[in-house]
């Protein structure tokens, strides 16, 4: 029986090592990943939190970013075809960020900051205006794979949706990740998602919805309560605080006074 002990120990050790090596490792996720065109990237080039706007990329695509301490950001830009009228292509842009958990089974749980997500829908053939709303959608990714793509020789990330459907492959674009600050950028007094609040931003057209405005008639942004924008919403500019008629007469008086002083 003695000769059997050593092979058994070796087999058990090999199994243990393979199990440890296969354990989920968040470090290999760290960075910014983008689909092949690399036109869509997370960060300030896709969402501008200062003026609360989504910036349209040159091509459609997907981008995800992950940090070692459990934060993520995602950016989607998709075209939606219309088989009945091919020229009427609509588009949708989505942006979210928040925290993620790498589970023991290798799945990923993505939990966004509920008030920060944004979505822009555009259907030029059916609506005169685009619809800009808050967006809040938690995600479960069944698994992921990071490896060197045999064709491009680039570091590749494959994500799989909750049902096993593969997401378009992404490639490492930045390491460390290109991301906006990993905190709530647009705090509100009541954190509700778009599905319940139905809040919209008017982007031009015939029927303007009723929305709160400043004293000068400008629409208040969705992120009006954010630290980086709330300070200046109701502050009038210098030109509104000066009486231009009074300034003109003061100039005339100074000219006359200067001329009289010169003649004396």
Swiss-Prot record:
Chief location of this protein within or outside the cell: endoplasmic reticulum
Transmembrane regions: 244-264
Full protein name: Protein rot1
Family per similarity comment: Belongs to the ROT1 family.
Region (Disordered): 185-217
Function: Required for normal levels of the cell wall 1,6-beta-glucan. Involved in a protein folding machinery chaperoning proteins acting in various physiological processes including cell wall synthesis and lysis of autophagic bodies.
UniProt-listed PANTHER family: PROTEIN ROT1
InterPro entries (alphabetical): Rot1
UniProtKB keywords: Endoplasmic reticulum, Glycoprotein, Membrane, Signal, Transmembrane, Transmembrane helix
Membrane topology note: Single-pass type I membrane protein
Intracellular or extracellular location(s): Endoplasmic reticulum membrane
Swiss-Prot/TrEMBL GO biological process terms: 'de novo' protein folding
GO CC annotation: endoplasmic reticulum membrane
Signal peptide, first to last residue: 1-22
Bias type Low complexity, positions: 188-197
Glycosylation sites (chain numbering): 51, 136
Single GO term (MF): unfolded protein binding
Species this chain originates from: Sclerotinia sclerotiorum (strain ATCC 18683 / 1980 / Ss-1)
């Amino acid at each position: 029986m003695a000769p059997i002990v050593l092979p058994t120990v070796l087999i058990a050790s090999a199994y243990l090592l393979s199990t440890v090596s296969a354990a989920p490792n968040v470090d290999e996720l760290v960075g910014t990943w983008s689909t092949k065109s690399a036109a869509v990237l997370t960060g300030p080039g896709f969402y501008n939190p200062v003026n609360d706007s989504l910036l349209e990329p040159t091509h459609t695509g997907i981008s995800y970013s992950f940090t070692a301490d459990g934060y993520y950001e995602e950016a989607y830009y998709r075209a939606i075809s219309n088989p009945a009228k091919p020229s009427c292509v609509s588009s949708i842009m989505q942006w979210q960020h928040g925290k993620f958990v790498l589970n023991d089974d290798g799945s990923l749980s993505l939990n966004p900051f509920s008030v920060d997500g944004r979505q822009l829908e555009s259907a030029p053939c059916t609506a005169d205006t685009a619809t800009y709303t808050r967006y809040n959608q938690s995600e479960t990714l069944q698994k992921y794979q990071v490896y060197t793509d045999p064709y491009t020789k680039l570091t590749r990330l494959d994500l799989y949706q909750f049902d096993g459907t593969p997401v378009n492959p992404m490639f490492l674009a930045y390491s460390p990740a290109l991301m906006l600050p990993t905190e709530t950028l647009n705090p509100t007094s009541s954190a509700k998602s778009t599905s319940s609040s139905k809040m919209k931003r008017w982007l031009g057209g015939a029927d303007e919805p009723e929305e709160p405005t400043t004293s000068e008639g400008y629409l208040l942004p969705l992120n009006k309560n954010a630290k980086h924008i709330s300070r200046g919403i109701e502050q009038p500019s210098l030109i509104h605080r000066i009486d231009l008629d009074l300034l003109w007469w003061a100039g005339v008086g100074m000219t006359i006074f200067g001329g009289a002083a010169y003649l004396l």
